[in-house]
């Protein structure tokens, strides 16, 4: 197998390069935003830039990046565009800038939307240029860029401006391009289209000739473009050299065709045009397909196009076609061919009279039609309306090969899509893993196209939706598997021994050489399948390794996935491995196959089952694992061996590799998706079209739902009637009781709901439009029935005063339908979620709610808040791992709940025993739940009924007299039982009050027996597993899990009969599209319908998306787009929370520009912590400029493992300064945008202050991506980069970075780089308005009483650079130590001898510690050149380090830092460093 060439990484230009560039000088003169006096617009500038900078450099990305970064498009090109100045250079410049924006994944159409007037003219010019001759004004390379621009347009149909232009190209009138017979056939198939067609013809007749000609040009554009492509394709020879421009043009063209076919609005009309052009036949017969090197990607793209042209969908209705319907279409085609043959071609009588199954295979068709002449074939095709009729006495102009392929490919039997999927192996093999076209390297730049599906706004059918996600999920995991294989195998250092075998010169923790491999079982296939049902093998390895690694291998559990690898190295013993060179040829990797562990074998060869019993101790170091192989892959390999004489792969394996369990769940998720595609997945009708991206996006909003609920009990949502009135501005609130004393929560609210034609319209936010009718809400206060006399009987209540927007979100969540809540940072997303859950629980006690989150941390936060509300904990259940992190003493996992039920049962039976005793009833009523039930029925209930009868009858003697309150207490039968409740139970003030108390007491008793009846199942079910299943299926009302757990366990949950009515998703914008979809289908449909009633998604699409490690999948396939984000883009109504209560108002301003209307809650202005300044620091937020330290800015020891020593030291110095002032270390977190910097900062903290009790460690040192969803009072942020902005250019990452701090944010960065970035301007314009040097007030200790923004009474010191700060902190620390020492001597008055003795002991101890620490940290720590630089900059602050023995954890020379590559970084491999462009962990 040929090793793929290593792609080159695109290096972004540095600041100095940017400044030196000719383009930058022009930008500063004509369009740079920071320049006040700009030169007037000059068209020659555009011509010059295009010719000299873009064309001359062969459209080099570096040049185009520079132009786009300088805001060339926004500030010069489009701002000055008009038909008068339009030219080739102008058009191409705009196209290049738009394409670059899409490559960088930044919004591209905003500029055009602001000034849309000339866009139609510009678009027409693009169309004209795309059809120009390739050897004319526009080169093929330029036309390829135009195709890419058109592709972006077709994929941006959600933008009104673009859609209005594209619709002129693709609509019913484009069928003008069909041959007349084919047009007639299509109109006959769909009769309603004929009416529209006649209307179009009429309208065309009314148009003036010029407009008609223009319309015809647009309608025939794609037909003409296809013809142009075919001519380019035919110009490529079979073996002679070919320019890559032609190949790239063809690849981009097929990509455009795929995208047009994969979108229903474009496919509806275009698929017929494409079919009529026979493009696929031309492509499959072309020379390019047969050119191995150049045509590989083209062939893969062509297969994708073939798949989509024959997709199982009705183009006109958009309905998915069933297997039977597809078979009927196939039979109709064959029979129409047979009819034509029978009527007109006597030589085809045998074919015409055969049954379909005999003649629809490719071989049969070739046998029948191959002998026919070209003219005859043409006539057959013309009878089927595939080609125009052949005139009499004329020969066909088509090749016989083309005509034969046209008929055969159209009529051959097809394998159904689901069959293909079921035959596909789930594990990747070496052919896929190292195929750069489908699994690109981390260096993917976004330039070329790839044979990958794209996730855009719309999908053809649910099958298409699942299939695209299936393929992308599979390939994304393949990319991670490739990284693991390359890391493990290269660590093992496979070399060729002198006898030609393999010798391993190294070792790897995650891989072991295989001693023996045997296939032990190949089970028979199921009926109708040709692959075995099961294939099992035994793998033996020798675990001569450290104990903890041995434990890891022996700890492999059932269903863990491993990989079997064959290496045949050709390099001799001792050859060094070079990571920069292709991996495969260095290690000689030949095969990779996946397997799934069944278990380890014991001494007798039996599988050791997973379970609570301890594992047997096995002797020796040899271990054998029984594994399941992929039956589909095994079948393919065996077929290849038998038919083609290939080597038996299963005799060759010599390495087994395991993976981290956390990253190794891909097979289970793929199986889940495949199972979904094999079942009739029933999505609720009200969601189906929205998920596919069609129809009215607001159709699932509660205001449009037919089953909208008029009256809702808001329970404890409102704190008072005033709160309720404030929550519904613009509504008339009518309370059913007039007494203010009775207008107390809880409230039931009746909303005006009308259906049919008079239904109220809602705007995009779900707010009702003003109508003539008054918006009247009828509010009914109601009293929660008394639950008993004990304090714990009182319900827990909500204490949060929700804003009116939060109330709208809660109201929407309680109603049936789809609710989308956009929650900016600090706006109370979790509180809203918990209140919705509580309200659904109380309003619909029979319904079950599923909670799904992205992370265990979010699930824990939800659970901690749910427990604070009035929800019975026996109805809560948590599935999956992570519950151990819950900060509560209660265990909500399955077995935790089982234990709770068993313990609670015993408690309740004790209560029954006490009740029995108090009533003087003999026997053992509390023996079981069953006996307790009989006791309640015969002893308790009878007494209660008798009591009620006596109390009522006591008032009948004198009908006019009011019932006597005293008799309520007198006749009460349970006085003795309630003797331990707060006394007196009955107040004696009124009959009604006492009667309510008596009923409350009975409710308390009744609840005991109700719970025991529920717990009765735990007496009947004996095993913990059965009990936990019962809890899941019957008992729990609120079930929580992560999206990953849902994807892994869907099969088990469905099998158990799991049911739910509502789904609430937190962190919805961070969940992968497919992982959001799977939880909708964790239950079987009832009578063919889904029972799902509500889907509430809460998230923030302006923060970071799901983590996708491979850049190609992230950008090219848009795999990072969550379902939540897609719904927002499609236009589904959202409730946008608009008041934050986390951060100071000034900090909120750094990111609130990204949201519609984000304000602050009142307490942000009022509470002292927000109004007080940050002690010792002049500003509450500041951007601090960091220049090169020792001539170095950013460094990159491994790919994408960026570090910046100067910033790292500066950040740690500020942290130490704050701690020395008295700030609690746990209130400070250090964030950075790259993993490399994170490791460097951690190293420096370990060296500087980690073990120092005066300073300590910050709360967290981590990346911005990992810190999403968390917060702290003070954030120190390092942006690392000095050459290019990098991935902070993604505004979502900027929003996360700016919104983590509550009280103080201090950012360390190269200001000259970041301030010029267009996307970051709103935040950086505020940051750069303040001084760019750190301003500190060293004499102001923490906490301070100074108000934020006040000028301090103390002197402000300006820190110019990192070395100055480092020395300042060192001196401050020494001063503090001396002051403390002086205090000890003066005030504690210790005897001098003790002081000296103590100092001496401490000195010796700390010296020894310092020595150990120094050796462990660096081996041999010598002063670095930083000493010299420090002494030059700050001569006064150069202490004598040698005398420092009082506390060596202080920085000896604080600038003598770790080297740019930290200790951790040096050892880091690409796997450890996670060399990921997105730099997420």
Curated annotation (Swiss-Prot):
Protein family according to the UniProt entry: Belongs to the CWF11 family.
Organism of origin: Mus musculus (Mouse)
Biased composition (Low complexity): 1455-1468
Feature: compositional bias, Acidic residues: 1396-1414
Stretches with biased composition (Polar residues): 1418-1448
Domain notes: Contains an N-terminal domain with structural similarity to ARM repeat regions; this domain functions as a scaffold for protein-protein interactions, but is not required for RNA binding or for ATP-dependent RNA helicase activity.
Keywords: Acetylation, ATP-binding, Helicase, Hydrolase, mRNA processing, mRNA splicing, Nucleotide-binding, Nucleus, RNA-binding, Spliceosome
GO biological process: mRNA splicing, via spliceosome
CDD domains: EEXXQc_AQR, SF1_C_Upf1
One Pfam family hit: Aquarius_N_3rd
Cross-referenced InterPro entries: Aquarius_b-barrel (IPR048966), Aquarius_insert (IPR048967), Aquarius_N (IPR032174), CWF11_fam (IPR026300), DNA2/NAM7-like (IPR045055), DNA2/NAM7-like_C (IPR041679), DNA2/NAM7_AAA_11 (IPR041677), P-loop_NTPase (IPR027417)
Described function: Involved in pre-mRNA splicing as component of the spliceosome. Intron-binding spliceosomal protein required to link pre-mRNA splicing and snoRNP (small nucleolar ribonucleoprotein) biogenesis. Plays a key role in position-dependent assembly of intron-encoded box C/D small snoRNP, splicing being required for snoRNP assembly. May act by helping the folding of the snoRNA sequence. Binds to intron of pre-mRNAs in a sequence-independent manner, contacting the region between snoRNA and the branchpoint of introns (40 nucleotides upstream of the branchpoint) during the late stages of splicing.
Subunit details: Identified in the spliceosome C complex. Component of the XAB2 complex, a multimeric protein complex composed of XAB2, PRPF19, AQR, ZNF830, ISY1, and PPIE. Identified in a pentameric intron-binding (IB) complex composed of AQR, XAB2, ISY1, ZNF830 and PPIE that is incorporated into the spliceosome as a preassembled complex. The IB complex does not contain PRPF19. Within the spliceosome, interacts with SNRPA1, SF3B1, SF3B3, SF3A1 and SF3A2.
Protein name: RNA helicase aquarius
Catalytic activity: ATP + H2O = ADP + phosphate + H(+)
EC identifiers of the protein: 3.6.4.13
MF annotations from Gene Ontology: 3'-5' RNA helicase activity; ATP binding; ATP hydrolysis activity; single-stranded RNA binding
Induction trigger: By retinoic acid (RA).
Record's keyword annotation contains Translocase: no
Modified residues (N6-acetyllysine): 1055
């Amino acid at each position: 197998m040929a090793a793929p060439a290593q792609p080159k990484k695109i290096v972004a230009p540095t600041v100095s390069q940017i400044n030196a560039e000719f383009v930058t000088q022009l930008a500063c003169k004509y369009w740079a935003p920071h320049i006040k006096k700009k030169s007037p617009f000059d068209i020659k500038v555009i011509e010059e830039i295009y010719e000299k900078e873009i064309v001359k450099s062969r459209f080099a990305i570096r040049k185009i990046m520079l132009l786009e970064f300088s805001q060339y498009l926004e500030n010069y090109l489009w701002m000055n565009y008009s038909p008068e100045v339009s030219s080739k250079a102008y058009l191409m410049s705009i196209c290049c800038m738009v394409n670059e924006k899409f490559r960088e994944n930044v919004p591209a159409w905003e500029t055009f939307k602001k000034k849309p007037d000339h866009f139609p003219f510009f678009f027409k010019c693009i169309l004209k240029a795309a059809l120009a001759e390739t050897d004319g004004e526009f080169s093929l390379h330029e036309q390829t860029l135009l195709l890419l621009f058109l592709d972006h347009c077709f994929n941006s149909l959600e933008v009104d401006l673009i859609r209005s232009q594209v619709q002129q190209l693709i609509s019913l009138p484009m069928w003008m391009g069909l041959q007349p017979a084919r047009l007639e056939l299509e109109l006959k198939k769909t009769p309603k289209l004929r009416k529209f067609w006649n209307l179009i013809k009429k309208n065309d007749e009314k148009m003036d000739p010029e407009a008609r000609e223009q319309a015809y040009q647009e309608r025939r554009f794609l037909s003409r473009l296809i013809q142009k492509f075919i001519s380019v394709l035919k110009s490529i020879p079979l073996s002679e050299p070919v320019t890559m421009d032609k190949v790239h043009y063809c690849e981009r063209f097929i990509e455009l065709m795929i995208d047009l076919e994969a979108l229903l609005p474009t496919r509806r009309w275009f698929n017929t045009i494409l079919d009529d052009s026979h493009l696929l036949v031309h492509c499959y017969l072309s020379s390019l397909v047969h050119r191995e090197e150049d045509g590989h990607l083209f062939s893969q793209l062509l297969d994708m196009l073939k798949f989509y042209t024959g997709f199982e969908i009705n183009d006109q209705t958009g309905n998915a076609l069933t297997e039977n319907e597809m078979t009927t279409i196939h039979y109709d085609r064959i029979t129409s061919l047979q009819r034509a043959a029978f009527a007109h071609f006597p030589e085809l009588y045998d074919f015409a009279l055969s049954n379909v199954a005999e003649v629809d295979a490719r071989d049969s068709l070739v046998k029948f039609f191959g002998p026919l002449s070209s003219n005859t074939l043409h006539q057959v095709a013309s009878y089927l309306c595939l080609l125009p009729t052949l005139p009499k006495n004329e020969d066909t102009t088509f090749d016989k090969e083309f005509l034969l392929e046209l008929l055969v490919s159209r009529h051959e039997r097809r394998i159904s899509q689901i069959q293909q999927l079921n035959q596909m192996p789930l594990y990747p093999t070496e052919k896929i893993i190292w195929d750069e076209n489908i699994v690109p390297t981390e260096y993917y730049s976004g330039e070329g196209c790839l044979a990958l599906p794209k996730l855009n706004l719309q999908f053809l059918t649910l099958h298409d939706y699942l299939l695209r996600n299936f393929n992308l999920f599979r390939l994304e995991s393949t990319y991670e598997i490739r990284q693991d294989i390359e890391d493990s195998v290269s660590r093992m250092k496979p070399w060729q021994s002198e006898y030609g075998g393999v010798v391993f010169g190294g070792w790897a923790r995650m891989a072991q050489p295989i001693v023996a491999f045997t296939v032990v079982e190949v089970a028979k296939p199921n009926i109708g399948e040709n692959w075995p049902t099961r294939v099992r093998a035994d793998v033996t390895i020798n675990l001569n390794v450290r104990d903890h690694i041995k434990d890891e291998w022996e700890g492999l559990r059932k269903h863990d996935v491993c990989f079997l690898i064959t290496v045949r190295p050709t390099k001799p013993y001792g050859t060094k491995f070079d990571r920069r060179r292709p991996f495969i040829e260095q290690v000689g990797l030949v095969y990779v196959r996946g397997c799934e562990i069944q278990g380890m074998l014991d001494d007798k060869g039996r599988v050791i089952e997973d379970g609570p019993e301890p594992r047997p101790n096995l002797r020796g170091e040899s271990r054998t694992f029984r594994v399941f192989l992929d039956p589909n892959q095994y079948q393919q390999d065996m077929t290849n061996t038998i038919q083609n004489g290939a080597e038996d792969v299963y005799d060759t394996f010599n390495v087994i590799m395991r993976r981290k369990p956390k990253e190794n769940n891909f097979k289970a998720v793929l199986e889940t998706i495949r199972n979904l595609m094999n079942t009739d997945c029933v999505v609720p009708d009200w969601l189906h079209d929205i998920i596919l991206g069609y129809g009215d996006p607001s159709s699932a909003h509660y205001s449009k739902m037919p089953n909208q609920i008029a009256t809702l009990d808001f329970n404890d949502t409102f704190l008072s009637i005033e709160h309720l009135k404030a929550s519904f501005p613009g509504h008339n609130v009518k309370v059913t009781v007039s007494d203010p004393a009775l207008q107390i929560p809880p409230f039931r609210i009746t909303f005006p709901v009308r259906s049919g034609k008079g239904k109220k319209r809602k705007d995009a936010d779900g707010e009702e439009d003003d109508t003539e009718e008054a918006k009247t809400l009828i509010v009914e206060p109601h009293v929660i029935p008394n639950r008993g006399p004990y304090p714990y009987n009182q319900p827990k209540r909500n204490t949060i005063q929700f804003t009116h927007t939060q109330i709208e979100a809660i109201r929407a969540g309680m109603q049936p339908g789809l609710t989308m809540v956009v929650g900016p940072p600090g706006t109370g997303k979790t509180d809203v979620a918990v209140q919705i859950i509580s309200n659904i629980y109380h309003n619909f006690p029979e319904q079950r709610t599923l909670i799904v989150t992205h992370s265990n941390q979010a699930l824990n936060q939800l659970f901690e808040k749910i427990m604070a509300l009035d929800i019975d904990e026996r109805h809560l259940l948590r599935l999956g791992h992570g519950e151990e992190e819950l900060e509560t003493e209660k265990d909500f996992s399955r077995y935790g709940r089982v234990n709770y039920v068993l313990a609670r049962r015993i408690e309740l039976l004790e209560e029954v025993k006490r009740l029995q005793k108090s009533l003087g009833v003999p026997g053992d009523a509390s023996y079981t739940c069953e006996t307790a039930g009989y006791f309640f029925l015969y002893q308790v209930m009878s007494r209660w009924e008798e009591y009620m009868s006596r109390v009522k009858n006591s008032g009948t003697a004198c009908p006019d007299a009011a019932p006597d309150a005293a008799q309520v207490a007198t006749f009460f039968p349970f006085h003795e039982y309630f003797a331990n409740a707060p006394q007196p139970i009955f107040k004696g003030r009124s009959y009604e009050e006492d009667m309510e108390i008596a009923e409350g007491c009975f409710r308390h008793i009744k609840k005991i027996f109700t719970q025991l009846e529920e717990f009765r199942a735990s007496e009947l079910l004996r095993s913990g597993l059965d009990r936990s299943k019962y809890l899941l299926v019957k008992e729990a009302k609120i079930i929580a899990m992560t999206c990953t757990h849902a994807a892994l366990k869907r099969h088990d949950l469905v099998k158990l009969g799991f049911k739910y009515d509502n789904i609430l998703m937190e962190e919805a914008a961070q969940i992968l599209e497919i992982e959001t979809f799977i939880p909708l289908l964790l239950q079987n449909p009832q009578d063919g319908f889904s029972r799902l009633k509500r889907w509430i998604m809460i998230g923030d699409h302006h923060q970071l998306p799901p983590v996708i490690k491979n850049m190609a999948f992230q950008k090219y396939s848009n795999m990072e787009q969550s379902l939540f984000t897609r719904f927002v883009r499609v236009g589904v109504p959202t409730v946008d929370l608009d008041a934050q209560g986390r951060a100071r108002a000034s900090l909120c301003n750094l990111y609130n520009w990204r949201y519609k209307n984000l304000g602050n809650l009142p307490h942000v202005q009022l509470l002292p912590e927000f109004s007080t300044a940050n002690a010792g620091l002049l500003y509450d937020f500041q951007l601090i400029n960091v220049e090169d330290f020792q001539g170095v800015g950013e460094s990159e020891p491994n790919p994408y493992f960026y570090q910046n020593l100067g910033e790292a030291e500066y950040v740690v110095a500020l942290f130490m300064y704050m701690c020395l002032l008295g700030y609690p270390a746990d209130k400070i977190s250090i964030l950075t945008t790259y993993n490399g910097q994170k490791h460097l900062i951690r190293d420096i903290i370990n060296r500087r202050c980690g073990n120092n009790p005066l300073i300590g460690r910050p709360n967290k040192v981590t990346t911005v991506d990992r810190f999403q969803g968390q917060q702290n009072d003070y954030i120190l942020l390092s942006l690392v980069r000095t050459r290019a902005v990098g991935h902070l250019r993604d505004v979502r990452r900027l929003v996360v970075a700016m919104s983590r701090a509550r009280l103080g944010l201090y950012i360390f960065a190269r200001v000259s780089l970041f301030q010029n970035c267009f996307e970051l301007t709103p935040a950086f314009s505020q940051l750069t308005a303040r001084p760019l040097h750190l301003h500190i007030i060293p004499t102001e200790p923490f906490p301070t009483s100074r108000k934020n923004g006040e000028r301090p009474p103390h002197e402000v010191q300006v820190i110019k650079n990192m070395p100055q700060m480092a020395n300042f902190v060192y001196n401050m620390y020494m001063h503090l130590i001396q002051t403390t020492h002086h205090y000890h001597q003066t005030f504690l008055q210790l005897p001098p001898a003790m002081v000296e003795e103590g100092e001496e002991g401490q000195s010796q101890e700390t010296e020894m510690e310092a020595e150990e620490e120094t050796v462990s940290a660096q081996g041999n720590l010598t002063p670095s050149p930083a000493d010299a630089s420090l002494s030059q900059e700050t001569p006064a602050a150069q202490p004598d380090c040698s005398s420092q023995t009082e506390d060596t954890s202080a920085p000896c020379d604080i600038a003598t830092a770790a080297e740019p590559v930290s200790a951790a970084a040096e050892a880091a491999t690409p796997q450890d460093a996670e060399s990921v462009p997105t730099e997420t962990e």
